[in-house]
């Protein structure tokens, strides 16, 4: 419809001699391609609220996260893990995780949460498993699904960069610093898998 209007408008000079007499410059019709995204664009704003949260049949909130890792440069294949600070100061270091929502796959949720909280992305690997844990207030049980993520890109600015710190640490430091017992178990599962493949 718009292109038809532009086409008709640009042909008005042929229909009315007064346009020539007025010495007007009428732009010629241009076809401007509309960019089509080939991949999803990641928002720089974290999702908030629980309206889209996924729960299992027992009422357990479904949470998903990652063990972001990389191979240390000049480290002979040594692995480093990325930990993030808790939102509240003094609550220690954690792995990135958050709610799995009903409009996304478990893999999409894992990548989204890791970008939002840690500002990294990369190659998601096979799930490490599922751990049950109690919420902060100990009133609700959550299922925590964790995936290894081989980091290929680290962003300088990310959705939660204003109130989270991040730190690359050795595997032993990660076990020592990680505050949540279920996350330490996920780290141990990750270490066991990597030991078997090396």
Curated annotation (Swiss-Prot):
Residues 59-191 form the Nudix hydrolase domain. The keyword Cytoplasm does not apply. GO terms for cellular component: chloroplast. It comes from the Eukaryota. Keywords: Chloroplast, Hydrolase, Magnesium, Manganese, Metal-binding, Plastid, Transit peptide. Expressed in roots, leaves, stems and inflorescences. It is found in: Plastid, Chloroplast. Its EC number is 3.6.1.-. Belongs to the Nudix hydrolase family. PANTHER family: DIPHOSPHOINOSITOL POLYPHOSPHATE PHOSPHOHYDROLASE (PTHR12629), NUDIX HYDROLASE 21, CHLOROPLASTIC (PTHR12629:SF52). Probably mediates the hydrolysis of some nucleoside diphosphate derivatives. This is Nudix hydrolase 21, chloroplastic. It comes from Arabidopsis thaliana. The lineage of its organism: Eukaryota, Viridiplantae, Streptophyta, Embryophyta, Tracheophyta.
């Amino acid at each position: 419809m718009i292109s038809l209007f532009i086409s008709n408008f640009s042909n008005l000079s042929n229909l009315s001699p007064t346009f020539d007499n007025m010495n007007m410059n009428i732009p010629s019709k241009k076809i401007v391609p509309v960019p089509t995204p080939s991949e999803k664009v990641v928002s720089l704003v974290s999702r908030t609220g629980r309206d889209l949260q996924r729960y299992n049949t027992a009422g357990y909130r479904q949470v998903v996260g990652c063990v972001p890792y990389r191979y240390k440069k000049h480290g002979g294949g040594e692995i480093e893990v990325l930990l993030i600070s808790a939102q509240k100061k003094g609550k220690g270091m954690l792995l990135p995780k958050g709610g799995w929502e009903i409009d996304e796959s478990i893999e999409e949720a894992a990548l989204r949460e890791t970008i939002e909280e840690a500002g990294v992305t990369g190659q998601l690997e096979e799930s490490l498993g599922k751990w049950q844990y109690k919420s902060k207030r100990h009133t609700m049980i959550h299922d925590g699904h964790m995936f290894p993520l081989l980091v290929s890109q680290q962003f300088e600015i990310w959705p939660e960069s204003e109130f989270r710190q991040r730190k690359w640490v050795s595997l032993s430091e990660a076990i020592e610093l990680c505050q949540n017992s279920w996350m330490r178990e996920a780290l141990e599962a990750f270490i066991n898998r990597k030991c078997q493949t090396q």
